[in-house]
UniProtKB/Swiss-Prot annotation:
GO terms for molecular function: carbohydrate binding; metal ion binding. InterPro entries: C-type_lectin-like, C-type_lectin-like/link_sf, C-type_lectin/snaclec_domain, C-type_lectin_CS, CTDL_fold. This is C-type lectin. It is found in: Secreted. Mannose-binding lectin which recognizes specific carbohydrate structures and agglutinates a variety of animal cells by binding to cell-surface glycoproteins and glycolipids. May be a calcium-dependent lectin. GO terms for cellular component: extracellular region. Keywords: Calcium, Disulfide bond, Glycoprotein, Lectin, Metal-binding, Secreted, Signal. SUPFAM superfamilies: C-type lectin-like (SSF56436). Homodimer; non-covalently linked. SMART domains: CLECT.
Amino acid sequence: MGHFTFISLCLMPIFLSLSGAECYTCPIDWLSRNGLCYKLFDDTKTWPDAEIFCRKHKPGCHLTSIHSEAESADLAEYIYDYLKSEKNVWIGLNDPQKERIWEWTDRSSTNYTSWNEGEPNNSWNKEYCVHLLASQGYLKWNDTPCESLFAFICRCQF
């Protein structure tokens, strides 16, 4: 009995620490990376409609934010592999106040950027939403009118 009690007491902290750990599983057709789930949607929407679509999946879902070169490369590969045609893809970066202050819809940090050369340029004073450029392998960003129709990628934590 003493041996069982000793082992039980030794293992108890392990079980208690695991009970607070969050387990996540992305739906089958979503990309899983670092505790987050990404899903590319091939149908085209305006930027606001794409953001609304993402939010309807689950509280906390948004058009994707991108925070590192590694995350950018993973997403570019995923998009390249699954998009049926060479379409630009909306991400969650925008300029909601139209003051050239870029914000992610999930309110995360904007310390990483990957603008295409010469961007953001706010051409014709109406480019307030951001997409991944198909012509740049989905690695570079461009500001464009929010009413443009593009494919889009959502990011969620399930």
